From Swiss-Prot:
Zn(2+) binds at residues 306, 308, 311, 337. The keyword Heme does not apply. Binds 1 zinc ion per subunit. Keywords: Glycosyltransferase, Metal-binding, Queuosine biosynthesis, Transferase, tRNA processing, Zinc. This is Queuine tRNA-ribosyltransferase. Belongs to the queuine tRNA-ribosyltransferase family. InterPro entries: ArchSynthase1/Queuine_TRR (IPR050076), TGT (IPR004803), TGT-like_sf (IPR036511), tRNA_ribo_trans-like (IPR002616). Gene3D superfamilies: Queuine tRNA-ribosyltransferase-like. Its EC number is 2.4.2.29. The active site is at 93 (proton acceptor), 268 (nucleophile). Its cofactor is Zn(2+).
Amino acid sequence: MKYELDKTSGNARRGRLVFERPQGTFSVETPAFMPVGTYGTVKGMTPEEVRATGAEILLGNTFHLWLRPGQEIMRKHGDLHDFMQWHRPILTDSGGFQVFSLGKLRKITEEGVKFQNPINGERIFLSPEKSMEIQYDLGSDIVMIFDECTPYPATFDYAKKSMEMSLRWAKRSRDRFDELGNKNALFGIIQGGVFEELRKVSLEGLVNIGFDGYAVGGLAVGEPKEDMHRILEYICPQIPADKPRYLMGVGKPEDLVEGVRRGIDMFDCVMPTRNARNGHLFVTDGIVKIRNAKYRDDTSPLDPECDCYTCKNYTKAYLYHLDKCGEILGARLNTIHNLRYYQRLMAEIRQAIEDDRFDDFVVEFYARMGKPVPPLQLADKS
């Protein structure tokens, strides 16, 4: 993988990731949003439908795919691309976030994490080395290091110890990745909670090890938005400019805009797909809660400005009807729309950066939703 930076507008960056795969060369235009395919599928969607929304890269979940179907079945198919029939780039997380979400079911040691398999109850062990081996079998185009996702709230001392262990695990991840002869990309993950000085130490340690890209982890875990913005404003300018920057697990449309304002290139989140299944649909001027009875006889399209299959063919009343009846098609049509909304948003962001009018775009984006523009806490790097 290589990263090409074309243009900046303030801190916002326009570029692309370029991947050489057996099927040819694939580009992922950045800033990019990655739909989440936890179990090797974006819920309810075929790969062709996901691609039709504009998605160029997907996220797969190492932890869940390790438990089911497992490495052996994955190897029998070739890799995750062959298993799910998506032959474009795939990024896989390391499994760290899911393991640490298990709470009392897991025990962290220097070696790794022992935990109870949530499927069958057996005790299993995940380490940096094991995570690299699983992701190698998945054929991930972008592999994430195994780290501890520092929870919120966390004291300075806890965040420091957690970050330092994540750095040691980063080196072990790098070493095992290289031993496997993996020719794909490996990203480091910056930790340190809401403490700027810890984030700086984490980044410096990762840069010394050397990675193909740098993710900001441990945000969107319950901290106030102001803290997330502050950490991004502080750390992004210090990340090597020739490497992509990935904000993990984020987020709402506003979060994507705010991330780009602060220099982020890549995002992933379950929000567009999960919200779609719950009847929360993103539109140009906010959110449509399709379960609201006022849409029962509404013959207008979901979003007149949207070019997705759902908006071109169906009314709000039909989507309301499908949801009310619990029809699977309702969830599918909602998902198509929400994923397309996110990809349209990213395309608009990329165009605004190209045209050097990203600041104007931000103002217009919030004006459409009737919201004020959140302030930047640090001065723009122009």
